[in-house]
Amino acid sequence: MTELAPKASPAHSIARVLVIDDSAVARGLMTRWVEEDSDLTLIGSAVDGEQGLRKAEELKPDLIVLDVEMPKMDGLAALPLLLKAVPGCKIVMASTLTRRGGEVTIRALSMGAADYASKPQAGRLAGAEEFRRDLLLKLKALAPRPIPPVPTQRDMAPSPAPATPAAPGAPVARSITPPPPPSSSAPAKKAFAPVAQPPQGRGTPRNTARPEIIAIGSSTGGPQALRDVIAAFPADVRSPIVIAQHMPALFTKILAEHLTKAGKLVCKEAEDNERLKPGCVYIAPGDFHMTIRKDAAGFYAVLDQTPPINFCRPAVDPLFQSVAEVTRGAALGIVLTGMGHDGREGARMLRSVGGTILAQDEATSVVWGMPGAVAEAGLADEILSLADMGPGIVRRAKGGN
């Protein structure tokens, strides 16, 4: 078979990409999409894991798109070898939206894959515009980019409000952009009012009591981060834990099963109007937003299919905003690795009523988008490595600070 010679990298290209897929149709489409994108450079393609490994060792790509099911050496077998051959390379699994595809994808993420893109099943790839957008977006989000460090809220000394307009480039409080109105077929849901960020260093005092709810948001790199965090929890956690992880339907159910095996807590997909139990982990099902309501008996999960927020459903912002409303600040919000800025405005609202916000650090995040947005807005009470995040949450879950 003729080897694909790498094309010259354009000056503004941000990443060099290798595509490994045994399907000629899928491989052809993905290589064409990468070639057409000026931010990416296609350096090669391969038909199975063995050939892909040889090319990876030779070409040293920044990013690899790796199919799951292949002859000779499948994606799961090739994954650890590729990670060893090209340290620092980010691998995106290309998997189908099936139970088998979901199982393998979650396993791959736990083994070190950075993310996944859900491709249509065979015969439907010709019109796979959503797959194209998703794949290219994730490849560019995973491309190596230096991001300067930012201070945590704890590092910021109290200061009086400025008497003059802020200098150019100074942080500006942003209001929440309301989602578009729901379609006629979707149930009407309560809108959350925008909350401006209090002046830095002069916000509502932090609530250091045991949180009534622990809320976690994550996206790219989230499954592995969640696994590490949940594994750190003891069996006697007294707060319910609610999670919004950007994932499609079916995959979130499989994720819950894997998280249950990883630690001492029971993890499950949340059900509509399900009462939250202390020490249980509830994951927003794929394609549903999850918010929290409260009555005299306790807290309940509420699911809806109102339009995506921040291009996501489930989204982190509505979850955090609802937690802020029902707990009035007696809550802990955690923003883990992920691309974009989902969770920033929810963290702003939660913090404005006295809640505590933790963000994952840049060094251990697969993509420092979501936690970086929270940190850069001055909303993080603490920025922690993934290794420190679980113990940090547990400490605060017991009423520590």
Swiss-Prot record:
One example of a Gene Ontology biological process annotation: chemotaxis
Cited Gene3D superfamilies: 3.40.50.2300, Methylesterase CheB, C-terminal domain
PROSITE patterns per record: CHEB, RESPONSE_REGULATORY
Keyword Hydrolase: yes
Domain Response regulatory: 16-134
Biased composition (Low complexity): 166-176, 185-199
Protein name in UniProt: Protein-glutamate methylesterase/protein-glutamine glutaminase
Species this protein is from: Maricaulis maris (strain MCS10) (Caulobacter maris)
